[in-house]
Amino acid sequence: MSVSNPPSSGKPLKLRVNKDSEGYLSLVTESGEVYKCPICGNDKFVYNYERGEAVCIVCGAVVQEQLLDLGPEWRAFTSEEKGQRARTGAPLTRLISEALTTVIDWRDKDVSGKELDIKRKLEVIRLRKWQTRARVQTSYERNFIQAAQELERLRSAMGIPRPCIEQALEIYRQALEKELVRGRSVEAMAAAALYMACRMMKMPRPLDELVRYTKASRREVARCYRLLLRELNVKVPISDPILYISRIAEQLKLSGEVVKTAIDILQKAKKAGITAGKDPAGLAAAAVYIASLMHGDNRTQKDFAVAAGVTEVTVRNRYKELAKALNIKVPVK
């Protein structure tokens, strides 16, 4: 049975998309009827990915707008080939591997927040004990779990994207396998791995900002970072100061015009060769500071220093260098 939806109908049909072996679409209504083109009666369509439209292959009529193709982009002709190309299934992440199971909460309360009675409380204590025994077996697993929990805490506190945490866990795993963690604190190694991961993913964070959220000192984290660089033979790209601009502007609620001007300033500074050997966060803070002054936003250098995680002196020095080299006439407020 088939149905066609005339162009003049008031309420559009909700259509389900099927894709055949040739790559053509067939549209099926909620009642299971095959949808046909209202112009020529054809039942095969192609999908316009740029516009999200289903187009008839015979007459070219757009039969459905804002259509979401939820199927795979690949084609398979056998069930074996389909299984090989499928990418669905449970997400495999570093955060749920290596015995990283759930934890029974230490607060003896039920789902509504009420205290458990004494009998139930003793039962939960016993279950928690066995959960801990069954969850972790080796020192390797215990160490890795501590690092994963520390990285998850840093992610929550600093708002770091999850891909950076995944990369940091991979770096920490390599350090564990090479026994680089022995004799060093988990907090320092985890922070160093996260600092490296953020730079590798081109989402850098200043080291001073990272240190504010961890128990380890700046010296410990820097030492562990140099150790990871040396022993893991990891190529970390040089941080581009432009990557810091959006975060600084977001924290200070600056306009898009200020961001664009700051990017232009740093691009000119790169061409002039005055960015080499300078702290990228300090350069970004100075560029955003200059751009904000040019657009009439007279905030203090301290505001930009705090947002970038650098000192006020650094912002002032980088400001003077940029203003002099690029001949920018903006007075210091």
From Swiss-Prot:
<keyword id="KW-0805">Transcription regulation</keyword>
<dbReference type="GO" id="GO:0070897">
    <property type="term" value="P:transcription preinitiation complex assembly"/>
</dbReference>
<dbReference type="InterPro" id="IPR023486">
    <property type="entry name" value="TFIIB_CS"/>
</dbReference>
<feature type="repeat" description="2">
    <location>
        <begin position="243"/>
        <end position="324"/>
    </location>
</feature>
<keyword id="KW-0479">Metal-binding</keyword>
<dbReference type="InterPro" id="IPR013137">
    <property type="entry name" value="Znf_TFIIB"/>
</dbReference>
<dbReference type="InterPro" id="IPR013763">
    <property type="entry name" value="Cyclin-like_dom"/>
</dbReference>
<keyword id="KW-0677">Repeat</keyword>
<dbReference type="InterPro" id="IPR023484">
    <property type="entry name" value="TFIIB_arc"/>
</dbReference>
<comment type="similarity">
    <text>Belongs to the TFIIB family.</text>
</comment>
<comment type="function">
    <text>Stabilizes TBP binding to an archaeal box-A promoter. Also responsible for recruiting RNA polymerase II to the pre-initiation complex (DNA-TBP-TFIIB).</text>
</comment>
<dbReference type="Pfam" id="PF08271">
    <property type="entry name" value="Zn_Ribbon_TF"/>
</dbReference>
<feature type="repeat" description="1">
    <location>
        <begin position="149"/>
        <end position="232"/>
    </location>
</feature>
<dbReference type="GO" id="GO:0017025">
    <property type="term" value="F:TBP-class protein binding"/>
</dbReference>
<dbReference type="GO" id="GO:0008270">
    <property type="term" value="F:zinc ion binding"/>
</dbReference>
<feature type="binding site">
    <location>
        <position position="59"/>
    </location>
    <ligand>
        <name>Zn(2+)</name>
    </ligand>
</feature>
<dbReference type="Pfam" id="PF00382">
    <property type="entry name" value="TFIIB"/>
</dbReference>
<dbReference type="InterPro" id="IPR013150">
    <property type="entry name" value="TFIIB_cyclin"/>
</dbReference>
<keyword id="KW-0862">Zinc</keyword>
<keyword id="KW-0863">Zinc-finger</keyword>
<dbReference type="GO" id="GO:0097550">
    <property type="term" value="C:transcription preinitiation complex"/>
</dbReference>
<protein>
    <recommendedName>
        <fullName>Transcription initiation factor IIB</fullName>
    </recommendedName>
</protein>
<feature type="binding site">
    <location>
        <position position="37"/>
    </location>
    <ligand>
        <name>Zn(2+)</name>
    </ligand>
</feature>
<keyword id="KW-0804">Transcription</keyword>
<feature type="binding site">
    <location>
        <position position="56"/>
    </location>
    <ligand>
        <name>Zn(2+)</name>
    </ligand>
</feature>
<feature type="binding site">
    <location>
        <position position="40"/>
    </location>
    <ligand>
        <name>Zn(2+)</name>
    </ligand>
</feature>
<dbReference type="InterPro" id="IPR000812">
    <property type="entry name" value="TFIIB"/>
</dbReference>
<dbReference type="GO" id="GO:0003700">
    <property type="term" value="F:DNA-binding transcription factor activity"/>
</dbReference>
<dbReference type="InterPro" id="IPR036915">
    <property type="entry name" value="Cyclin-like_sf"/>
</dbReference>
<dbReference type="GO" id="GO:0006352">
    <property type="term" value="P:DNA-templated transcription initiation"/>
</dbReference>
<feature type="zinc finger region" description="TFIIB-type">
    <location>
        <begin position="33"/>
        <end position="64"/>
    </location>
</feature>
